[in-house]
Amino acid sequence: MWKLKPPLEMPLSLKYKHILEQLMPTEPSISLNLKKLSAEEEFPNLAKNQTCMAKVLTIQMYKRLRARATQSGFTLDDIIQPGVDKSEHSSIRIVGCVAGDAESYTVFMEFFDPLIELYHHDYQPNRMHRSNLNPENLKGGTNLDELYVLTCQVSTGRNVDDFCFPPHCSRGERRALEKLAIGALNALDGEFKGTYQSLKNLSEEEHQRLSAAGILSENLISPLMLSSGMARDWPDSRGVWHNDMKNFIVWVNKEDHLRITSIQDGGNVKQVFTRYCLGLKKVLRMLLLELKFGTFPMLTELVSQK
């Protein structure tokens, strides 16, 4: 006769595995533990640097801020790297820094506030931004001399709150943002009805067509995008949308989550601005509908680069 053995008691290592795993220290690769030398040894060489960043950043400020990071892990060295790489003299004033997320502007306020003041002048941190997108308030600008004005363009960047900005966002964030943008842009109608072109799936024929229309250029990736990290995983989740008239264009996941542009030949800047105001409102309205039915937070007017 076979006798059944009593069931073995579960080993304690298995029984309490889930508790032990919670008590284990975090893997070194997961925690933010930057191995750095002293501030003097890590401070960049700014002797001939002409950027605004170089005029603001001091060794004392670097000592105070270099160990800080936003919750997503963006550091002061990440912020200043584009300016460190862009050290040669330029006739154009270059800011020389980027923000990795909205929190960058508060965590590194000691750096950003004087930098914004240097670039824009009369900047006051406690002053609220007031937007005036009523084209009726624009006086004149309907017939600028076309001997001097070939093209008029109005452009702005928009980012979705709680997503990292392009210098720091992950592949998953970028893909979620592209999906959000496509849903909103494809819902536009009237003069804003148009087509989204994914750069990843762009055929040679489509590339030539968009280049001929002035929407694409040969050098889509700028030095700033390379040094800041904006070009990571290019062209994954990047694309451009344009209306049928090709005078209202939206870039997705380039320098900002969205870069919205109204453009046309000639000197009627008021017409361009009117289209920009109306189109921007429509895009944001459609985005808010997508946000309402999805899990996306609200839009912000902060941008990744000043």
Regions found by a protein language model. Give the residues of each.
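Long, Pro/Ser/Thr-rich low-complexity/intrinsically disordered regulatory tracts in eukaryotic proteins
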Residues: 2-305
